[in-house]
Amino acid sequence: MLRIAVTGIPGIGKSTVVAKAAEKLADQPGFKIGGIQTAEIRKEGQREGFSIMDLATGKTGVLGSIRESGPRVGKYHVNLEDLEKIGANALRSAMDCDLIVIDEVGTMELKSEAFVSAVKVVLESDKPVLAVLHRSSSHQLVQRMRREFEVLVVNEKNRDGLPGKIANRFREMR
């Protein structure tokens, strides 16, 4: 079973690499992708937070925002309700998929025990996984994933070619 994680400095394009790789795989007939994807929420050019989306259903919510209440990570407040209703549920319901995407296992997501538990369920399965890992987290779950996954560091030189390389690796696995 193939498990790949991407990591790198903030803003380098980790989520973009994973999204583009997943897009390439989704073009294959009968290839079902589940899990979660995050994206920036911007207003007038300023980042105000992050959204979270269930890849199977398209359901979207707010992961963190400068306008929310909840546990604080930097200037953002984590929306535990959406993280658990959308994020944790998406991971639990992705067990019938050909690939589970987890974007991201980072500081905000790790504030939710339900999310951590859902990631552990995925890790205990035999499912292929493509994940984004926080670059410097010392959290036990992130450290486990670093040990168990092939970890690719995204940088300016490799980020354009990585989506195709990652997609090809998962295609070869089928």
UniProtKB/Swiss-Prot annotation:
Domain of life: Archaea
This protein's record includes keyword Hydrolase: yes
Protein name: Nucleoside-triphosphatase THEP1
Record field: catalytic activity: a ribonucleoside 5'-triphosphate + H2O = a ribonucleoside 5'-diphosphate + phosphate + H(+)
Organism: Methanosarcina barkeri (strain Fusaro / DSM 804)
Key word Nucleotide-binding present: yes
GO molecular function, one term: ribonucleoside triphosphate phosphatase activity
InterPro entries noted in UniProt: Nuc-triphosphatase_THEP1, P-loop_NTPase
CDD domains in alphabetical order: RecA-like_Thep1
Family as reported in the entry's similarity comment: Belongs to the THEP1 NTPase family.
